[in-house]
Amino acid sequence: MQTTHLTETHFADLPINEQVVKALSAANFSHCTPIQALSLPPLLEGNDIAGQAQTGTGKTIAFLVATFHYLLSNPQPTKKQPRAIIMAPTRELAVQIFNDAELLSQHTGLSLGLIYGGEGYQSQREKLEEGVDIIIGTTGRIIDYYKQNIFSLAGIQVAVLDEADRMFDLGFIKDIRYLFNRMPKPTERLSMLFSATLSYRVQELAYEHMDNPTHVQVEPERKTGTRIKEELFYPSDEDKMALLLSLMEEEWPDKAIVFANTKHSCEKVADWLQADGHRVGLLSGDVPQNKRLKILEDFTSGKLDILVATDVAARGLHIPMVSHVFNYDLPDDAEDYVHRIGRTGRAGQSGSSISFACERYALNLPAIETYIEHAIPVTEYQADALLRDVTPPKPRHKKRMQNGRNPQKRQSSGSRNRRKP
């Protein structure tokens, strides 16, 4: 974790439980981000919060600090039943929240349970049966265990809903209401809701299940963030891949995400980058959950330098120190452009966004520039200067099942072992 001085407010200057302050200090957190400086004072006084903030603003630490502070300041004699619940729309976001929460739990003695679908059914169940103080997870699996009477929600002191707008988008709102209705009354618990937008339906949810929440809002001056350098190219279809490979060689990003609009396009990009010697991870909707988590772990730790992804990875993922975002395809939804390039330039760091307005997706550009309220600076390129001497990737083999035979597995094209001299 890095120390980022975004406000003059120090965590140590706030009336936060001493154990939590020590945990923050051990993780190199000293100064509050704007959303933390705005939300923590009312939360520390026991007031509910409905906060508007984008991913990457520090909201996770804000609600974790408030949660740990409240539980430590209001101890309960009962054991083995959860005292706080943090609900997230996706498995990846739940894992990231859990990882941040571990930094605080190591110094406070509060136990955590990570609950999400797709894997680990028995191990997660056993963890809940042992007893945890804080449940972090997705609603479907949480409800599954709840209906089996594995745990009770009667002792919940803190409830957190992260990315509430995304919950609506994914159709999880019935699950949210189901869980809220089985907790103590809003007046008997501390509740926090965070969302990228405080739409009417999100505000309605807040007033329905929270106790007169204080509204806090942090919006960047520009939707795309002033620390992100934006750049636009107009490649021909023939030059598009060569331009991407050339820019990778020229920019040599420390950590980059390349977005494409389809699974097929992502596979093509990943194959060419891998053939050129880069260390690449491919993340799309049909990648198995255990493999998705391994790819994200390797990308975060630096074992992979480039992540090629569809928009499934554009929201909710907190991956620190992403230096570059490439829009190989301009997104069909203007809002997705903001979510994509928001993966870089986080927490006071600078970042670069490079977009291709190709023959197929250039028509998406006017809507994007209208939404972000500025034109993206255009850079010209010389077609004859592009990188062309790249060994083409091996063709992908379609999976077949004939006469009981398994499909032949494609061999990896190796790791990215070149570095700038």
Swiss-Prot record:
InterPro entries: DEAD/DEAH_box_helicase_dom, DEAD_box_RNA_helicase, Helicase_ATP-bd, Helicase_C-like, P-loop_NTPase, RNA-helicase_DEAD-box_CS, RNA_helicase_ATP-dep_RhlB, RNA_helicase_DEAD_Q_motif
Subcellular location: Cytoplasm
Bias-annotated ranges (Polar residues): 403-415
Disordered: region residues: 389-421
UniProt keyword terms in alphabetical order: ATP-binding, Cytoplasm, Helicase, Hydrolase, Nucleotide-binding, RNA-binding
Motif interval(s): Q motif: 9-37
GO cellular component: cytosol
Helicase ATP-binding domain: residues covered: 40-216
Annotated ranges, domain Helicase C-terminal: 240-387
EC number(s) from the headed UniProt entry: 3.6.4.13
Known function: DEAD-box RNA helicase involved in RNA degradation. Has RNA-dependent ATPase activity and unwinds double-stranded RNA.
Family: Belongs to the DEAD box helicase family. RhlB subfamily.
Subunit and partners: Component of the RNA degradosome, which is a multiprotein complex involved in RNA processing and mRNA degradation.
HAMAP family per the UniProt record, alphabetical: DEAD_helicase_RhlB
Protein name from the UniProt record: ATP-dependent RNA helicase RhlB
Lineage: Bacteria, Pseudomonadati, Pseudomonadota, Gammaproteobacteria, Alteromonadales
